[in-house]
Amino acid sequence: MARPDLARLKSLFTQLVDLPSREQEAELAALSLDRETREQLRRMLAADVGEASAATRLREQMSEFREGIDESDVAEGDQLGVWQLGPMLGRGGMGAVFAARRTDGQFKQEAAIKVLQGRPSPQALALLAAERQILARLAHPHIARLLDGGSTPKGRPYLVMEQVQGKRLDQYLSRRPLPLEQRLLLFQQMCAAVAYAHAQLVVHCDLKPSNILVDQDGQVSLLDFGIARLLDAGISDDGSQVAKAYTPGYASPELQNGDTVGAASDVYSLGIILKEMLGQTFSRNADLQAIITRATRTDPAKRYESVTLLAQDVEHFRHGYPVRARGGGWLYRGSRMLRRRWPASAGVSLFL
């Protein structure tokens, strides 16, 4: 028996879940559905309980359905286009990652291939192809490039990513006692990459330490840019994303609530990452506390208006200038001026 279309189930569930039970049944009866889809949707709606948001309930009800999807479509040695799969490097909520190498004889190239979970409908596959074109144009020294993409013989989308050498951000920081200045420089590299992507109208939506690699020279590379966007079933009229994939602990409140999100969601995630990078010792500084607080406000409108402004405040802190997040009056600004000019001020005082 054919499985119900996953993308359509998502759409129908979202339409019906907030209706009263009687209206749900009436709408369900009026829909032109095959028996399997109707029964699957009815089970999902019947299991809906509690006060969670529609998006949260959707994730919970779809999880059981997703578990039944065959994950054995591809294996080491399989060929996807011009790429031959190597060993599996890992598996996560979004799919499995394989090492890969190019085998068409044009030139030698190593890559990482992420095979995404699920089998989208033809309409969703068309959206995925369009989104891949956008992501493939992201060219920044701190963003891992999207090289290629397609679908497996059984219809699962895959992405071919630049292979990046380095350690996860959290592992990199735990293995070496980096001073504050170097930690902030790493963070500013991340901000530069995210700001660049935002200028191309691409939001990451899943920024976290495991998606940030640091090489032996202290250079940052952001992974999985736009993967959450690719997994989304659609985009709103104004181009902002209604995302459904996220990592608890780093996701913004609006992302967790299933609301429409934009650049402010990435600002929030960067604020959480900055807090973790600084640890208890460095984050006690009042200016840094203010920066983190501003970036992680619950209300997106009260955060930094852009990642660029967040990075700018970090830059001001590094050089002893007042930070926007503090606001502050003449006393605060005066104290920062004295810090910047301390040697000269101290010298003058000796002669007064």
Which residue ranges define each predicted feature?
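AlphaC helix of the eukaryotic protein kinase fold
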Residues: 117-137
